[in-house]
Amino acid sequence: MGDILAHESELLGLVKEYLDFAEFEDTLKTFSKECKIKGKPLCKTVGGSFRDSKSLTIQKDLVTAFDNGDQKVFFNLWEEHIPSSVRDGDSFAQRLEFYLHIHFAIYLLKYSVGRPDKEELDEKISYFKTYLETKGAALSQTTEFLPFYALPFVPNPMVHPSFKELFQDSWTPELKMKLEKFLALIFKASNTPKLLTIYKENGQSNKEMLQQLHQQLVEAERRSMTYLKRYNKIQADYHNLIGVTAELVDSLEATVSGKMITPEYLQSVCVRLFSNQMRQSLAHSVDFTRPGTASTMLRASLAPVKLKDVPLLPSLDYEKLKKDLILGSDRLKAFLLQALRWRLTTSHPGEQRETVLQAYISNDLLDCYSHNQRSVLQLLHSKSDVVRQYMARLINAFASLAEGRLYLAQNTKVLRMLEGRLKEEDKDIITRENVLGALQKFSLRRPLQTAMIQDGLIFWLVDVLKDPDCLSDYTLEYSVALLMNLCLRSTGKNMCAKVAGLVLKVLSDLLGHENHEIQPYVSGALYSILSVPSIREEARAMGMEDILRCFIKEGNAEMIRQIEFIIKQLNSEELPDGVLESDDDEDEDDEEDHDIMEADLDKDELIQPQLGELSGEKLLTTEYLGIMTNTGKMRRKGLANVQWSGDEPLQRPVTPGGHRNGYPV
């Protein structure tokens, strides 16, 4: 009862607010009258209406101060009402604040009638200078803002070419629009009554918790089976080891007594200790009587730490699967695409995963060989956001494996569909990420590189990378890596030469980006395109060497060495030997054709099964079990001896997953 009394005023206020919102006018009058008779106080500031009116007033005051050039009023309101976590932690807020300081610093120069008041102008410039030396110093290494640090020291910024953009008529309205959008996002005005909000959040929370617990149960059961298999294997190995140890102790005792150990006995002990894969092949081919052989082979057998005896997954009825992928409900399609992807991503690398992939390919799961109008590939253009995303994820999983890329490359329409989806997809970030990831992995293959260059993908990438802060880390990293792979080809360099100034500006800006994972790809792209004389001339004209030397002062040792190579390339007069490769030779280069199954493929799943609903492997083996037709296939063996030193810029096609994992490049 005490708790109710403590919150009675607020609870009654919630009821009053909802009755007012739902227009129960008579009920509200009766309710208010009875509260007054009983002496029950009503909270007057409950819900969103009061907060909304206050937030709208703050937004209006900020915009007014912006329009009037009232610097102190604006930043007092800014610091009071914009959370410090946003001001200090959000990159967009930091960039916006920087440009707002520029706006107030040049306000008198732009809008004064006649000559601006010198004292007032000096005060504004001094305020801006103080900002640059304190909070604004954090952005001093960003190429975008570097020229503005000279603004307080330029006698007449209006005529200086570096600041020409600031004094254009469109600059201030565009900045004001960004400010208004930012403020609307921060304050999030809402007229929804608090009682309704509490009800909806509570109901949704319970539903999400139930689904989450169900999913956790499914995952726990799957992990439990995996751990049980591992435990049984470890226990068997332990018992085997104890048995061998006991025999060795007996043998040592026999040796002390003068009995000799036979080569056959030594061989039998060693074979029992070797991993399963080596036992049969070594049993008859190794001479264990030679001193040192047994111990050397034992140590070698420990090198590849692999799970043993991984069973093959059950075969599936692919005809029924493909039929339901084309004709089933959107929810069924999504669960099937998810389950098929999980088969690839969660299977054990080696024979199990190879068998899964080979079954998909031999049954033409994605209809790459089909010419029918209705095919599984068409799911990439589904009206359902979930189906489109899950189809893109599955294609990305295929593209993560060398044999999968070879399968997808057989049909040029796959590439064209992915390129189209990349440029059209504006609703779902994860769909776009997976399409981009697949295309980036496609760029490991020379024929696909050629097709992407001819389709003008370089121009699209450069345009997207002009504003990297709007991109997710995955999109940024894979976009830059794809651009680098295409720039390694002579046709790609020639494409870049058509917009040399723009490409150089975008790449030089990216060198200073806070995401350091992209630096090797940016360096590789710059180094490659600077082998073209016309691009070198453009780079020299824009002072590229000075820009690069700025990064040397702040970069790490690896980045510094790469930039030194780029500067050397920039100042060269002739093409280095072997830089420009012929585009006529479309032979595959398997050195870089690795399997790269990154964890991002299964992140942020959109759908969860309801109670009693099948998903994952259980869905496949319950509804789509087929006749056992699994057959293994030998992997293609590529060269694996070309390593990247890290000192020089990348000069071979790579993909971020493989590059991070240290695969040869």
From Swiss-Prot:
Pfam families, A to Z: ARMC9_ARM, ARMC9_LisH, CTLH_Armc9
InterPro entries found in the cross-reference section: ARM-like (IPR011989), ARM-type_fold (IPR016024), ARMC9 (IPR040369), ARMC9_ARM_dom (IPR048959), ARMC9_CTLH-like_dom (IPR056327), ARMC9_LisH (IPR048957), LisH (IPR006594)
Occurrences of domain LisH (ranges): 7-39
Phosphoserine: residues bearing it: 582
Coiled-coil spans in chain: 201-235
Region feature Disordered, mapped onto this chain: 642-665
Tagged with keyword Acyltransferase: no
The keyword Cytoplasm is annotated on this UniProt entry: yes
Cellular compartment(s): Cytoplasm, Cytoskeleton, Cilium basal body; Cell projection, Cilium; Cytoplasm, Cytoskeleton, Microtubule organizing center, Centrosome, Centriole
GO cellular component: centriole; ciliary basal body; ciliary tip; cilium; cytoplasm
Keywords: Cell projection, Cilium biogenesis/degradation, Coiled coil, Cytoplasm, Cytoskeleton, Phosphoprotein
GO BP field: cilium assembly; positive regulation of smoothened signaling pathway
Chief localisation class: cytoplasm
Function of the protein: Involved in ciliogenesis. It is required for appropriate acetylation and polyglutamylation of ciliary microtubules, and regulation of cilium length. Acts as a positive regulator of hedgehog (Hh)signaling. May participate in the trafficking and/or retention of GLI2 and GLI3 proteins at the ciliary tip.
Assembly mode: Interacts with TOGARAM1, CCDC66, CEP104, CSPP1 and CEP290. Interacts with NDUFAF2.
Protein name, UniProt field: LisH domain-containing protein ARMC9
Lineage, top ranks: Eukaryota, Metazoa, Chordata, Craniata, Vertebrata
